[in-house]
C-alpha cells in the first residue's frame, strides 16, 4: 500500500531568523505517513530559483560551519501540516533564543509512532525529547528511562488538576502541552432538514439515532480507535469524578480489589447497544482511521453524528468551509452531557540522552505560557495552565462551557497503573467484531490483572 510521505524543513540563519519553510511530498512504499522538520543554520541560496529564476527546481543550501552547535532530536506524532506549522514557529523561536542548540523534529502518525518509539529505545537509540501517552509512560517509568522534569521553571504555571496528574512521589516525568477533548460532532444542516434537535442527554440521543436509523441512515460515524472507548470511559467513570471518589476507585482497581469490568460495564453496555441497534456500522468503523477517514466521511454530509477528537474541528472546517457543524458534549447521561479530556501531547526527556541540559532547556521553552497557548489554540484544545485561555474555535464552544462547568472525565487518569487506553480500544474492537459483552468484560479483567504497572 502506498501513501504520501511528507518532508518539511525550516531553514534558519545565523541569528535564528526563519528564512524559509519548504514542504514536499513523494510516493514511497513505506506504508506510513512521515513528516520531518530539521532546523539548520544555513544560507538559503535558492530563494530566487523558487520564485521562478535560476536553473530548474534545484535548491542549493550552503551550511554555515559552527562547531559550537549542539543538535538534539525531537520525535513526535504530530504530523499534520497545521500542527507542524506551529511546531516550526516554536522551534524557530527557540533557535533564535538559543543559537548554540539545533533541534531536529521527526514525526510518525498514530500507533506507528509508538511502535517506532519503542523500537528506538529497545535499540538504545531513543531521541532526546519525545511525545508520550499514559500507557507508554507506565513502561518507560518502570524501566527508569525518563528524566525528572520537576525542576523546570514552567512547572509552577500548570493548573492544580494537571499537577495532580503529573506529580508522582515528588517527581515529574512528563509535561502536557494541551488538554484534548472528545466530543460529538453534529451535522446541523442534516438535523434541521429532518426536524431533529441537537441531543442534550441520552434519551434524546437515542431518539434521534432511532429516527435516522428508520430513515435508512447510520446515525453515528465511529473510528477504530478513540470513538467508542471514550464513550465507554466517559459514561463509566463520570459519577466517580462528580462524587470525588475517583482516587479510591482507581486505588482499588490498581490493587486488584475491584474488577475493571465492574466499573466499565455501564459504558460498554451503551457501546454494545449502539452497535446492536445499528446506530454505528461496526464493520465500517473497524476500517475507519481516526481524525482521517472519519472526517472525510462526515463532511459528505450524509450522517448526523461523528465521535472523535475535538482537535480535528479546524481540519473539518478546512475540508469544507461551508459545512455547518458543532462539537457537542457526549450526551450519554440522563441529565445531560460530559466531556472526556486528556492531558495531551506530553513531552518527556530521555534519561540516556547525551544532551540532557539542552533537552530540558527546549522542553522548558516549549511549555512557556505563550507557546502552550499557541499550540493549544491551533489544536482546538484546552490549556493545561492556570491562566490558560479556552480555544476560540466557534465550533467547539459547547464543549468549552461543559469543560468549564466541571462535567469532565479524564480518559487516561495518571492514577491508573495499567494501560487503560489500549485495553479500552481493544475491548471496543472485540465488541465491533461481534463478541458478547460478558466475554469482552471477562477478557478485559484478565488483561488488566496481568498488566498492572505497565506492559
Residue ranges and their predicted role:
Residues 90-93, 97-161, 189-200, 296-297, ...:
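Extracytoplasmic "Venus flytrap"/periplasmic binding protein-like
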Residues 2-6, 12, 21, 46, ...:
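Conserved N-terminal structural module of periplasmic/extracytoplasmic solute-binding proteins
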Residues 92, 96-97, 102, 193-194, ...:
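Extracytoplasmic/periplasmic substrate-recognition and gating elements
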Residues 138-145, 162-199, 217, 223-252, ...:
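Periplasmic solute-binding protein
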Residues 88, 376-388, 397-454:
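C-terminal capping/gating helix-and-loop segments adjacent to ligand/active sites or protein-protein/ligand interfaces
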Residues 64, 148-158, 240-266, 318-319, ...:
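Short, solvent-exposed loop/beta-turn-alpha elements that line the ligand-binding surface or hinge
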Residues 211, 253-285:
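Glycine-centered hinge/linker elements that transmit conformational signals in sensory
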Residues 109, 133-183, 197, 206, ...:
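Hinge/lid segment of periplasmic solute-binding proteins
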Amino acid at each position: 500500500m502506498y501513501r504520501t510521505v511528507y518532508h518539511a524543513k525550516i531553514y534558519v540563519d545565523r541569528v535564528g531568523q526563519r528564512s524559509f519553510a519548504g514542504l514536499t511530498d513523494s510516493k514511497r512504499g513505506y506504508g506510513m505517513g512521515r513528516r520531518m522538520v530539521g532546523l539548520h543554520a544555513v544560507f538559503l541560496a535558492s530563494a530566487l530559483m523558487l520564485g521562478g529564476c535560476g536553473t530548474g527546481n534545484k535548491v542549493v543550501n550552503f551550511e554555515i560551519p559552527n562547531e559550537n552547535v549542539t543538535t538534539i532530536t525531537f520525535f513526535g506524532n504530530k504530523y499534520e501540516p497545521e500542527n507542524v506549522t506551529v511546531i516550526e514557529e516554536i522551534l524557530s523561536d527557540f533557535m533564535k533564543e538559543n543559537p548554540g542548540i539545533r533541534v531536529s523534529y521527526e514525526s510518525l502518525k498514530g500507533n506507528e509512532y509508538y511502535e517506532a518509539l519503542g523500537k528506538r529505545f529497545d535499540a538504545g537509540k531513543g531521541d532526546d525529547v519525545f511525545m508520550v501517552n499514559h500507557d507508554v509512560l507506565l513502561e518507560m517509568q518502570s524501566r527508569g528511562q525518563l528524566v525528572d522534569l520537576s525542576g523546570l521553571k514552567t512547572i509552577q504555571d500548570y493548573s492544580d488538576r494537571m499537577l495532580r496528574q503529573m506529580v508522582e512521589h515528588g517527581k515529574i516525568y512528563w509535561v502536557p502541552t494541551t488538554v484534548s477533548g472528545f466530543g460529538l460532532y453534529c451535522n446541523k444542516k442534516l438535523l434541521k432538514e429532518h426536524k431533529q434537535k441537537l441531543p442534550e442527554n441520552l434519551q434524546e440521543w437515542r431518539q434521534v439515532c432511532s429516527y435516522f436509523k428508520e430513515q435508512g441512515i447510520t446515525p453515528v460515524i465511529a473510528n477504530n480507535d478513540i470513538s467508542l472507548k471514550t464513550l465507554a470511559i466517559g459514561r463509566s467513570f463520570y459519577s466517580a469524578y462528580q462524587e470525588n471518589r475517583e482516587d479510591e476507585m482507581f486505588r482499588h482497581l490498581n490493587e486488584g480489589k475491584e474488577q475493571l469490568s465492574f466499573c466499565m460495564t455501564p459504558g460498554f453496555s451503551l457501546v454494545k447497544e449502539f452497535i446492536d441497534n445499528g446506530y454505528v456500522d461496526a464493520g465500517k468503523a473497524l476500517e475507519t482511521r481516526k481524525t482521517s477517514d472519519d472526517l472525510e466521511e462526515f463532511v459528505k454530509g450524509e450522517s448526523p453524528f461523528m465521535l472523535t477528537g475535538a482537535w480535528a474541528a479546524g481540519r473539518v472546517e478546512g475540508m469544507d468551509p461551508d459545512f455547518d457543524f458543532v462539537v457537542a458534549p457526549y450526551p450519554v447521561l440522563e441529565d445531560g452531557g460530559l466531556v472526556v479530556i486528556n492531558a495531551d501531547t506530553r513531552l518527556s526527556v530521555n534519561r540516556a540522552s547525551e544532551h540532557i541540559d539542552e533537552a530540558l532547556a527546549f522542553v522548558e521553552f516549549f511549555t512557556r505560557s505563550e507557546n502552550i497557548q499557541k499550540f493549544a489554540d491551533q489544536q482546538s484544545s484546552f490549556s493545561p495552565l492556570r491562566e490558560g485561555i479556552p480555544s476560540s474555535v466557534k465550533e467547539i464552544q459547547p464543549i468549552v462551557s461543559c469543560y468549564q462547568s466541571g462535567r469532565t472525565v479524564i480518559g487516561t487518569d495518571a492514577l491508573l497503573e495499567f494501560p487503560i487506553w489500549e485495553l479500552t480500544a481493544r475491548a471496543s474492537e472485540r465488541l465491533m467484531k461481534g463478541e458478547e459483552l460478558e466475554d469482552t468484560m471477562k477478557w478485559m479483567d484478565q488483561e488488566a490483572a496481568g498488566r498492572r504497572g505497565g506492559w
